Amino acid sequence: MSELIEKAKQAQQASKQLAILTTEEKNRALKQIADQLLVERTYLIEENQKDIEAGQRAGISQTLLDRLLLTDERVQAMAEGVEQVIALDDPIGDQIDEFTRPNGLNIRQVRVPLGVIGMIYEARPNVTVDASVLCLKSGNAVLLRGSSSALHSNKALVSVIHRGLEAANVIPKDAVQLLEDTSRETAKEMFKLNDYLDVLIPRGGANLIQSVVKEASVPVLETGVGNCHVYIDESADPEMAVAIAVNAKTQRPSVCNAAETILVHSAWAKEHVSKLIEELRIKEVQIAGDEQIKAVAPFVKPADESDWGTEYLDLQVAMKIVNSVDEAIAHIDRYGSKHSEAIVSETDANVRKFLTNVDATTVYHNASTRFTDGFEFGFGAEIGISTQKLHARGPMGLRALTSSKYVVHGTGQIKK
């Protein structure tokens, strides 16, 4: 039996035990995980360093190395994240609806776990912990398939999670499984594991996500890439617009809710775009601009078609001048990834048009795109940000990891 099948079977068996646990029992296990992360932080950092050194030898970019890195502060943040999940309401058993039919049948719709969740993700060790604790709290087992470049880190984290679960003696450690075989062939086999997996959630770049979406027969919760836009309207407050655009691009450029393109109304640009460009340059942002942007700032790289569709995940941004909110919406409709889109404006009609017509998980008025996040929305940790429309959309917290069932109580009714 392959490692994949064996671990998937074990996860499925564990999910049945996990589904019937009380909130208190699940929280007790999560508390042990949080404590164990802190107790073993030195071990975690030492194992992570093996991945960092291998990544440096392989020439991995500094941006990817930063995502991969575990520090004392980051392990502390992981443990705090587990504590925050403990504090969240448990959705399992929540009543969604209740009604009584004329024949006397009482029908309740309640939340239940999905079952076994397959996570496929790139070199982000924090996802190992986030996904595990969110799945456990929502009554699900999880099969983790991380990147080969984070294998030492992921093995160490899962071993720490297992020791926490063993200390609590409530949740079987088989509820959290890590695939150590990170080959593409095994990943493709995982895509077809309908007998054991209830859903697949990919987290990573566009190529990873699209390969899962196109090839999987297991249902997929698609976490899309973030080609996000900030549109500065003609009436935008200059100081606010510059602050929002710069924040959306530079506060943390390597994440999916960072802005990748700034669209600027031509009337606003006449007076203020040079200030925006100056502030971006202070933050060391490389700009790719259209001809009108280059006319103001000749040092800007000329933008080509590929720039409008690129998720840079770095200190790079595309800039374009538009003549109306309609032109901005059309550009976003063509190049956007349906993630997070913002308008900075004081014109109510334009704001309404933008918020209504832009197709995205989250649309903003006079705020940075950087708030599309489970913690910022008050959901706690997230397992990803869904850009699809079925089952879940936007930041996916605990509720997104549940399904529902109808519970029907009768008094002897039979169908006539």
Curated annotation (Swiss-Prot):
Could you identify this protein by its name? Gamma-glutamyl phosphate reductase
- Molecular function via GO: glutamate-5-semialdehyde dehydrogenase activity; NADP binding
Please state the gene responsible for encoding this protein. Answer: proA
Q: Which GO terms describe its biological process?
A: L-proline biosynthetic process
UniProt entry tagged with the keyword Amino-acid biosynthesis: yes
One Gene Ontology cellular component annotation? Answer: cytoplasm
User: Subcellular location, in the record's words?
Assistant: Cytoplasm
Give the enzyme's EC designation: 1.2.1.41
Q: Does the keyword Translocase apply?
A: no
Q: Name one Pfam family in it.
A: Aldedh
InterPro entries in alphabetical order: Ald_DH/histidinol_DH, Ald_DH_C, Ald_DH_N, Aldehyde_DH_dom, G-glutamylP_reductase_CS, Glu-5-SA_DH, GPR_dom
Entry-linked PROSITE patterns: PROA
